[in-house]
């Protein structure tokens, strides 16, 4: 794609906007290299990957990029066999953890929606938890190694601690004995050796080694001879500690070296995911959608918005071309929004061709072009001494030389900057030359001659930007099919120009021209009314949709309540039946006891008959319950449009409005609801409804499957009581969603909130274990909870 067009369309500002959402500098490099792709397949795939990331953001919240660092340099050093610093190792460990957690982030149940491209990328991740654990167990901070890094280091540091305690006791004793010679009763350390501050005039009274003196020379820092051996022992231990730390770092670096291919692979994937999710986050910030893409030259942008204009001020744009016409000529007065229309169209095109979602309504369509050429604005060069006209013409000549049927050309004020008659004629010739090649064109102009050209030329359509004569302001709405009108007379009249002057001016214009302008005015008025009617219709449609949603919610609520009541009733009935059976068995036992004690067999016979009748009634009642729960009706092997079917999960009948699709789903009109139901879940209408119990279970399963739970909860700003309440609910949802571990963000602060949360976690039945966050996870500001 030619850089000039990208520059005038302000494409690079879009890339700057995306960079705000990256986590690694390696991903920033990918954004710097981003440009429109060279094939339809690439464009579709990259839009789809952005859309998948966007949907994951909406469903699962922020991806696990905490602690995702650019480790390119560290990995390169490890590959060459160098020993890495603690900070570098921590960053590599964080990157590996980020990669592993991404596999958990995209995991889903079999029946839930899959994300083909993102899952395919993540399938290449090779979890290296062993390396992660070794790094995080050994290294606490960028300059701090854990005592647990090795048994040798633990032993050395324990010895150091003991030696330091011994030397402190000894130096304190010496200070007491030398107190009258000291500047102050405080020991200090110089060159990693314990020393005491002796007044210069008493240095002979304290035998030892002089290590330093104060700035005034009044104090000498002396290491008493009695401390020399202990200081030497401490120095030896410190050297051993340093050597052991270097050995540990070499060992950890060697672990990375052994798995360098997998480490580099994971680093590359994390960088790619960072890039993809940055695109998705930017899409969310501009309220973007994924457009359809074709290679037929068809553009249909619905309510498109320029992403760099303030959302509160931007006017949505509707523009289409490529079916009935391939060239669009936008005419009308200056400052009417023609250039914004041109830039919006071009920018949304190159955004989509770069795999980005665009700020427009769902189902907008963008065409793939091999090149987008733009001649917009005044980019004349002072050094080249080019006039406005010459500057534009130089660019236009280049466009005419290169543009073909797979190109989109955007002209702003074509033919301007020279004599109007010649400029208009030249503009028509340029448009006609490109049109004959099949080039797709959007051009703006204020020449009336181009209106006539568009009216009489095949595949060329007029358009204008609406102007409100009442307020003397443009509305910036594009009216396709209606040429622009200058409105000079109306504007002049409203600004106070005398009527007789305006009438004299009218006489200077031909009757045909005036009639044509009046026709344009009438068309614009009708278009405005049509727009108003359309907006009213859309408003009514939205209201109807809201009413439908409320109705469905009420129906669902009523159905759920009814099912719950029926389920409870059946459960209670079963309980009564079981109790009655137990009572009947007790009666029989009593009868046998009576017979044993000598009561007549006749009495026993009557009791036996009574018991049998009771048992039969109970069995009949139980069987009727079981039948109603068991009998769901006969399954359907196929359906046809217009057929009446029964939907057990809703306990409703419906009419088939579309037959089975590739997913095995059938379109059903059930009351006012239009729903898709799996064919296997439909029954013939002459069968009994599904049991309320099973229906309730299915609804619960559906709700669980649809519900998404974030990987973390943020409690900052809440008091302890509210935080505990929210965390308790969140842990229930996370457990039901099958999450393995979650993060509770409570902040560092005074520790009150953290302690309250930890106390609650000890008692929660879903919690297997919990710990404070490691480096890159949030440290003591978060608690990582592992669920059962």
Swiss-Prot record:
Record key words, sorted: ATP-binding, DNA-binding, Endonuclease, Hydrolase, Nuclease, Nucleotide-binding, RNA-binding, rRNA-binding
Domain Smr: 713-788
Annotated Pfam families: MSSS (PF20297), MutS_V (PF00488), Smr (PF01713)
One annotated GO molecular function: ribosomal large subunit binding
SMART domains in the record: MUTSac, MUTSd, SMR
Binding site for ATP: 332-339
Tree of life domain: Bacteria
Family to which this protein belongs: Belongs to the DNA mismatch repair MutS family. MutS2 subfamily.
NCBIfam families: mutS2 (TIGR01069)
Cited HAMAP family: MutS2
Subunit and interaction comment: Homodimer. Binds to stalled ribosomes, contacting rRNA.
Protein name in UniProt: Endonuclease MutS2
Gene behind the chain: mutS2
